[in-house]
Amino acid sequence: MAQRYDRAVTIYSPDGHLLQVEYAQEAVRRGSTVMGLRTNNAIVIGVEKRSVGDLQEERMVRKICMLDDHVVMTFSGLTADARILVSRAQMEAQSHRLNFEKPTTVEYITRYIAQLKQNYTQSNGRRPFGLSCLVGGFDEDGTPHLFQTDPSGIFYEWRANTTGRSSQPVRDYMEKHADEILTIADEAAAIKHIVRTLVSVSSLNHTQMEVAVLKYRQPLRMIDHQVLADLERTVRREIEDEAEASRRPRAP
């Protein structure tokens, strides 16, 4: 039945679905896990790092991109599609600076990306972008924002969110610890929370993750692998201690 309605992106299935858009969302679900967290003064991004061949240049395999000096984006899904979106968004940000002599807001550039994605769900001869993006940054007054866009073109603002292959268990974990996330005030606690989530839920080690921090009017900072290694040891020890404590018989 599906094959009758997935030949073109503009054809609805009988139950009201655009199957090409759903296929694009499946590409996202098969992509690397990425997550973002917004504090009062920082945007912290954590991504699953794919293994790189011994002869491959590691700098060419990046999932964290700057759209402007104050906006960072990461994604899950098709890297080639992301390259096009990043290039278009960067040009839009530069054009906005030239025309209005001030940087874009984070919502403006997110809305531009979402509109571009949505346009590709209504045109023949095209296919939807097969990626979901997390866009974080600061407005001119220093207000931090974190948005997510989907292949369909919708976007929402979040305090913390994730996308990719482990997005559901990671989101469940974050919702379980929502009170803790809402009280995170500094970047150190945010970095530790992201490392703990990737270690405990996605079963990653420090060599399989990248973490970046963006602060107001400061350049993007990649967290050193030695720092990630130390944090991994700390959170693994905490997880073991919590598991041991839960196994102890409770006092009557």
Swiss-Prot record:
The keyword Nucleus applies. Signal peptide: none annotated. SUPFAM superfamilies: N-terminal nucleophile aminohydrolases (Ntn hydrolases) (SSF56235). It comes from the Eukaryota. It is found in: Cytoplasm; Nucleus. Its main location: cytoplasm. GO terms for cellular component: cytoplasm; nucleus; proteasome core complex, alpha-subunit complex. Gene3D superfamilies: Glutamine Phosphoribosylpyrophosphate, subunit 1, domain 1. Testis specific. Belongs to the peptidase T1A family. This is Proteasome subunit alpha type-7-1B. It comes from Drosophila melanogaster.
